[in-house]
Amino acid sequence: MNAVFATLRKNAGVAPLLAFLAIAFFVPVATVLSLALWSPAEGFSLVALKRILLTPVYSTTLLRTLEISLWTTVMCLLGGFPIALLINRLRGAAKTSLYLLVLLPLWTSFLVKSFAWLVLLGKNGAVNALIMALTGAPASGSLLFNLNAVLIGMVHGLMPFAVLTILPVLDAIDPRLTPAAASLGARPAEGFIKVLLPLALPGIAAAGLIVFVTSVGFFIVPALLGGPRQTMVANVIIEMVLDLLNWPLATAAALLMFVVVAAMFALYIRSFGIESLVGRGRTLRQSGAAKELSRQRLEFQRRCWLAWDSVVVPLGRLPLLPHLLRHSLWLGPLLLVLFLALPALFLVPVSFTVSGIIDWPPQFFSWRWYAALDTPTWRSAAWRSLTVASATGVLSLAMTYPAAVWLVRQARRSRLPVLVLMIAPMIVPRIIIAIGLFYLFARIGLIGSWLGLVLGHTVIALPFVLVTMIAVVQAYDERLDQAAAVCGAATAMRLRRVTLPLLAPGALSAFLFAFVTSLDELTIALFVTGGLSSTLPKQMWDEALLRVSPTLAAASTTIFLFMSAAVLLAQAVRQRRSPAQRTT
């Protein structure tokens, strides 16, 4: 009995988080996926899966989802790596400014970004206005509701994830390696391909995995910017559950989506190890995953060098091309950063238009669309979103801090299985989590409740907060506590004067991450509210399905300014850290 209590005390830090995930994540997801293979009336059955695979409209939608997700992933990596490399090379204020320009669209709502592209790509939008100004030809029509619009919206929304996943890996690479390769006779391109690119491969692969998993579960961008031919699996699942109440087909589609994502995740884990996904890839053993990674790096290096010799080197002999390439090394990433940062700004002037439609240029000046937000419906949705986001941040922080301490102090073999369980919600598409919670909450009376929203949003936010808190705990030097104890400080004083001040900036960043994730979350709200209540994203979604009006631009501008303030606050807190903390 004493041994049991000792084990419980030793693992007390991780127990609450695992118990929460077991109840609010693993059980709902496993239950809802099992419905695709089993029903109380028929028992085990593959009818729903066969119908999904053999019905042309469903199988085509599945293949289209994979195609759009793959294209999105490739374009995010091709654009995100140069941006991350440029940020890595910069120093001082320039690096901070560029980092903020990438961070701001990351924390901007997907709905806001989609509405921005409605303004830009519409028939009377800014892009058509620019084309008319440059060519003098009248607009040929809307640039919306096609594959190009969907890809633009998805790449714009997900490229910041790729940048911020690759950047820590680049920062961890010793900057002396490339000059060392040059001193041994390697050309700049050769040093890049044979040294830098293979070392950055784990970060590139992690970014690809995160972008692909998120893309597979996307429904906002295809619904707002795409047409019927751009319908994705998540859109089909939403229609089947909320409109048709066809649970067998919905869960069969979800199961196929889960199988694809699980296969990608297993391939990543086999190649790079789970810890590389949370920024601890350097702890790989020199057997198994590490040897496989070394082999893949060599093969990747060989293929890159063959492509360089067969394509880029012959092009380099063309006049002026080397000069253009040198300038594109910084100009291209800067243009991509502007592509990420500027679209949301177009919503600001549109929110002050006199016109009742979204067009460009807007007809100034009116506050009527902001006044339209001052209604009980919008106020209630905003208040519910703020309170749910605050509770999500507090609950996530309360569970992840002790779990992060436990993970950092455990041996690698002990922590790896637990780490896989804890970050699982980051890998499973949100639409699957949402229908799982909907199925569970409908049976225990939490549909439409404030608590149901908090629990659902916490499931989504936990992996991201955990990764942040692991970095915070790793950076904390416990010798400072020991030094304070030697100087006679009691436990309460050490906690108040040493531990909390040093952990507070990182904890605040983690809280803001959970807060913003909750504030932007639509998928969970779409199911868990059950039409009985509304959050701000769901209210905006319902309005957009009825009519896209400048009211949405006003709401989007308000959210955008609020998110911008949160980003600037987090950056200000980060810059005010003490010198002692920066060195820990």
PLM segments and residue spans:
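Membrane-helix/interface signature in polytopic inner-membrane proteins
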Residues: 167-182, 187-188, 470-480
